[in-house]
Design a protein with these regions (language model features):
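Short coil/turn segments at secondary-structure boundaries
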Residues: 26-27, 45, 70-72, 144
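Alpha-helical scaffold segments in soluble metabolic enzymes
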Residues: 9, 27, 57, 107, ...
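An N-terminal boundary/leader segment
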Residues: 1-53, 60-63
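Immediate post-signal peptide segment of exported/extracytoplasmic ligand-binding proteins
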Residues: 58-75
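Short glycine/serine-rich loop/turn segments
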Residues: 71-154
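Short, solvent-exposed polar/charged micro-motifs at secondary-structure junctions
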Residues: 52-55, 131
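Residue-level detector of short coil/turn "hinge" positions at structural boundaries
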Residues: 20-21, 68, 119
Length: 154
């Protein structure tokens, strides 16, 4: 059995009341911020405050019988290629690290939020998405937890 539950298993746990979005989000944040894990190379930004607020809101809605989508309450990350309002989108490049923060979310981010997904942070990527291998000399190259090549299944 896989030590890391699948998104399907986590969604089933939420639906059955075995776990809350707040519990899942705290577990995701803990793992992302663990200095012994890959979190420092995987995440370019962790937005714990916003994630905790979204998880609490999701749990409140679920308790009222409102489930917006199958993603309701599930912690997710967003590649540093997509704008998140109030955050700098670097696209994996140091050239953009001092760019002004995004004024609005990318449409895909709006859709995730509308679906009830909990965005815990932004993830590393190849500079300007120019490689399928996930290599990034500026922010580090994260390892794929399933021993495959980063950026795709090879």
């Amino acid at each position: 059995m896989n030590a890391v539950p699948t998104i399907t298993q986590l969604a089933a746990d939420l639906a059955a009341g075995r776990r809350t979005s707040q519990q899942l989000t705290e577990a995701a944040l803990t793992r992302a911020q663990d200095p012994a894990s890959e979190g420092a190379r995987v995440f370019t930004l962790i937005d714990a405050e916003r994630a905790r607020a979204a998880a609490q809101a999701s749990d409140t809605l679920r308790a009222a019988g409102i489930v917006r989508s199958p993603l309701e309450g599930l912690p997710v990350s967003v590649k540093d290629l997509f704008d998140v309002a109030g955050q700098v989108t670097t696209s994996g490049s140091v050239v953009l690290k001092d760019a002004p923060p995004a004024e609005r979310n990318a449409p895909v981010v709006d859709r995730l939020i509308a679906a009830g997904a909990v965005i815990v942070g932004r993830t590393n990527m190849t500079e300007f998405a120019f490689s399928g291998l996930g290599l990034n000399p500026h922010y580090g190259t994260p390892k794929n937890p399933w021993d495959r090549k980063d950026g795709g299944r090879i």
